UniProtKB/Swiss-Prot annotation:
Catalyzes the MIO-dependent deamination of L-tyrosine generating the corresponding alpha,beta-unsaturated acid, (S)-beta-tyrosine. Substrate binds at H93, N205, R311. Disulfide bonds: none annotated. The modification 2,3-didehydroalanine (Ser) is found at S153. GO terms for molecular function: L-tyrosine 2,3-aminomutase activity; tyrosine ammonia-lyase activity. There is a cross-link at A152-G154 (5-imidazolinone (Ala-Gly)). This is MIO-dependent tyrosine 2,3-aminomutase. Keywords: Antibiotic biosynthesis, Isomerase, Lyase. Changing Y303A: Despite a decrease in activity, it shows lyase activity over time and still produced some amount of beta-tyrosine. Changing E71A: Despite a decrease in activity, it shows lyase activity over time and still produced some amount of beta-tyrosine.
């Protein structure tokens, strides 16, 4: 099934604690789809609350309910202080700094937290679920600073900024800017909530920051991999490359990694109908015909194989895909997990544990960062392949259409692509950066939200690298005069570029061209072009 559809019907997303997907989170975040908390989930939450309250009334010690928090667990707190204890927790941990998450990112975080609480083991009252759902459905979006999470005990600081809005404090976004929550709630006639036993803790003690953001990053990264395949196919056609490296038997039978199979299938589909590509058998026959009798060694201008950057696409992009598939799987598990502490199960002892620890997501998002970094490397090397006259199979230096020397063509446009590859490589794994905190109570932490933010940064950088490649591939088509021989998919891709940016005839200001195409990539425009203009269903 294609990852991106031309049109998506806006139907409510069921938030039941069991079935939420990365794709559904994107719908809530990006398309502003509404959410529905099923009656069964409300009933589970109510049952969990009743179990909890029965325990609490017996004065049984419960972390964060009759005790202080974190390292201060040794402090016993009377249950008469329940509201004050929960409110103080939220206020004190609303200490995030730095830029605010974008509105779609904040919506993803809220959706992730709502689904975790809807699983029914966190002992919050149903009104908490209903209020978070109301926020998503009415477009009330908490203003959440990006910096402050250690990824264990979950994303405390970011989620505190969500919880603070429920009690009428902190800020929400209006037109992308923070305004006081109290003002917005008053305008809408919404009464702030009073947090009861455990509810402050349940709201903030979990992985929903890294998981919500990670869902957006991984979903978009899968689309970026597809768009990398699209431009690679166009570029291969422009330089009259071979389709043989993508034959099914070399992947489905010989080396059946799922991502490799999917990428090879996409490459075959994208170049189907091309009058420019060649096959290995044709090259072999031509080489045999060219060989002079009686010579043991002779030079030929016929290359049976092109460089790795034009041949190892299934192996490289396919491995990126496999990494993203793994991350998507881990995110789906985490989205549908109870990841606060403590947890309550009927007929069982209170579970005091550490499900808030973000290590699974931290590792997964670091893997994503590594994979996307290599995707950027591949794109930059493909750019170089058509800009370097010694490697470009007859194309002029830097794709200059006029007088080389007087004009520089794409020489300058290559620099940001190369610089961004280097920048991506400086972004090391955050999951190995544990720093003890909280009086050494939190002595091993995941830094998972940093991992997710790092992956987001590389994703954004790659859109700019790929933008240069799209521009260069279209320019190669123009200079070579090979448009008529392109496959239907390549023509659709070329025309999508040219709707944004004209051919580079003489040198001009290039930054705007790159940003226009990068923005189109971020919106999935080239996926839509393929879906609209061809019958190809990309994997």
């Amino acid at each position: 099934m294609a990852l991106t559809q031309v049109e998506t019907e806006i139907v409510p997303v069921s938030v039941d604690g069991e079935t939420l997907t990365v794709e559904a989170v994107r719908r809530v975040a990006e398309e502003r789809a509404t959410v529905d908390v099923p009656a069964e989930s409300i009933a589970k939450a109510q049952k969990s609350r009743e179990i909890f309250e029965g325990i609490a009334e017996q004065n049984i010690p419960i972390y964060g309910v009759t005790t202080g928090y974190g390292e201060m667990i040794y402090m016993q707190v009377d249950k008469s202080k329940e509201v004050e204890l929960q409110t103080n927790l939220v206020r004190s941990h609303s200490a995030g700094v730095g830029p605010l998450f974008a509105e779609d990112e904040a919506r993803a975080i809220v959706a992730a937290r709502l689904n975790t609480l809807a699983k029914g083991h966190s002992a919050v009252r149903p009104i908490i679920l209903e209020r978070l759902a109301q926020y998503l459905n009415e477009g009330i979006t908490p203003a959440i600073p990006e910096i402050g999470s250690l990824g264990a005990s979950g994303d405390l600081a970011p989620l505190s900024h969500v919880a603070s809005t429920l009690i009428g404090e902190g800020y929400v976004l209006r037109d992308g800017r923070p305004v006081e929550t109290a003002q917005v709630l008053a305008e809408r006639g919404i009464e702030p909530l009073e947090l009861r036993f455990k509810e402050g803790l349940a709201l903030i003690n979990g992985t929903s920051g890294m998981t919500g953001l990670g869902s957006l990053v991984v979903g978009r990264a899968l689309e970026q991999a597809q768009q990398a395949e699209i431009v690679t196919a166009l570029l291969i056609e422009a330089v009259r490359g071979s389709t043989s490296p993508f034959l099914a038997e070399g992947h489905d039978i010989a080396r059946p990694h799922e991502g490799q199979i999917d990428t090879a299938a996409n490459m075959r589909a994208l170049m189907r109908g091309s009058g420019l590509t060649v096959e290995h058998a044709d090259l072999r026959r031509e080489l045999q015909k060219d060989k002079e009798a009686g010579k043991d060694v002779q030079r030929s201008e016929i290359y049976l194989q092109k460089a790795y950057s034009l041949r190892a696409i299934p192996q490289v992009v396919g491995a990126v895909r496999d990494t993203l598939y793994h991350a998507r799987h881990k995110l789906r598990i985490e989205l549908n997990s109870a990841n606060d502490n403590p947890l309550f199960f009927e007929g069982k002892e209170i579970f005091h544990g550490a499900n808030f620890h973000g290590q699974p997501i931290a590792f997964a998002m670091d893997f994503v960062t590594i994979a996307l970094t290599q995707l950027g490397v591949l794109a930059e090397r493909q750019i170089n392949r058509v800009l370097n006259r010694h490697l470009s199979y007859g194309l002029p230096e830097f794709l200059v259409s006029g007088d080389p020397g007087l004009h520089s063509g794409f020489a300058g446009a290559q620099y940001p692509a190369t610089a961004l590859v280097a920048e991506n490589r400086t972004i090391g794994p955050a999951s190995t950066q544990s720093v003890p905190s909280n009086g050494d109570n939190q002595d091993v932490v995941s830094m998972g939200l940093i991992s997710a933010r790092n992956a987001r940064r590389v994703l954004s950088n790659n859109n700019k690298i790929l933008a240069v490649e799209y521009l260069a591939a279209a320019q190669a088509v123009d200079i070579s005069g090979r448009f008529d021989g392109l496959s239907p998919a390549a023509k659709a891709t070329y025309e999508a570029v040219r709707r944004l940016v004209p051919t580079l005839g003489v040198d001009r200001y290039m930054a705007d061209d790159i940003e226009l195409v990068a923005d189109a990539l971020s919106r999935g425009e080239f996926l839509r072009a393929i879906a609209r203009e061809t019958d190809i269903q990309l994997r």
